[in-house]
Amino acid sequence: MTRVSFDLSRAKQMNLSEFVDSISLVLLETNDYSLLKSVQALNVTDSLFIVEDKGVMLSFNKRGDFLFSTCSLQGEGPHDYYSGMDFTLLPEGNIEVFDAVRCKLLSYNKEFQYVSTYKLPKDILPVSGYLYLSDDYRLFINKNELKLFSVSENKIVDMYEELGIPHFNIFNKNGFQVKGNSIFVSTKHQNYYYELIVDKKKLELRAICEFDFGDEANLDLADFPKGKDERFYLKYFDNNPRKSYVTDKYVDDERNMCFFIYDNKSYFAYQNRRMGINQVYYNEISTQEQFMLANFYKNGVFYYVSEPLYLQFLVDKSLMSLEDINKIELIREDDNPVIICYKLK
């Protein structure tokens, strides 16, 4: 296992130009059929942006032009879904929607035309998200447990429970990152980055990287007293601001990166092994150049969905082309959110 160490005493105010190569903007088309209210998830393919907005899935091309929506598929018909809790992309390009109320997986093509339905047993609940692993396996995610479901056997074949603090959301959908045939897991409130192994109907989380912020700042859930109510732990956070509360971690062939809260500020730790960069940055409220927890990461690019009002605080125009700078002038406050694409060094 690799250990990545960061020195918090050397943390500096956010400076995007030190780790971002370029910034581009995608203005999502705003019309009566594509109006976004509260973006909950983003997925990026080679040709599409797929946005989940309050249970509705909408697709846009790479220019931001609106293509299709599942709005008309919300209902009680045989090919409709009642509650779109989560969605995932299948290898052939179809989109699978998890209806938590009816315990169904419904598959649609890229134009959101109905393909198939799979009925799930109710014992998979409670669930906060899910992930496609293979034609036979789906992974259902709850706040501190994982459930491996076999389609061919129509049942849960294994479970993994993180024996931490029950009030903490250790697992969340954004923490699962697919790279080729491998799946990696970034848990919250922990410094480890895992590879998810599925072998002979068994789940295993294998730690491959540890993020180290120093003995005084590292948070170890094993040290927490058990059996306390949620208020106890919230008060602990308030009383111990100089602990690192990890939100998301990202590891690729060149970089180790982590978003976390420390000393009542949001931080970003960045290491580029090829370039020899190892630095920690923090955001200052109401100042320009802030770097927020991303909605999606792929191939060295962070994607963040920003409301137009906040865009000015999240970009450095010196890293943008003239075309993208001019796009800012076209945006109105009541337009759809903007996807900011941060290409990393």
Q: Each predicted region: which residue ranges?
A:
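Repeated scaffold domains used in trafficking and secretory/extracellular systems
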Residues: 37-41, 80-86, 124-133, 167-175, ...
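Blade-level signature of beta-propeller repeat domains, shared across WD40, Kelch, NHL, RCC1
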Residues: 300-345
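Conserved blade-ending motifs and adjacent loop-strand segments that build the rim/top face
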Residues: 208-233, 242, 273-299
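Short beta-strand elements that form the blades of beta-propeller/WD-repeat-like
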Residues: 5, 47-53, 93-99, 132, ...
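Short coil/turn segments at the loop-to-beta-strand junctions that recur within blades
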Residues: 32-33, 71-79, 120-127, 162-167, ...
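Asp-box/WD-like beta-propeller blade repeats and closely related beta-sheet repeat scaffolds
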Residues: 82, 99-145, 158-168
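Blade-loop segments of beta-propeller domains
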Residues: 29-34, 38, 65-92
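A short helix->beta-strand "capping" segment at the edge of beta-propeller domains
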Residues: 8-36
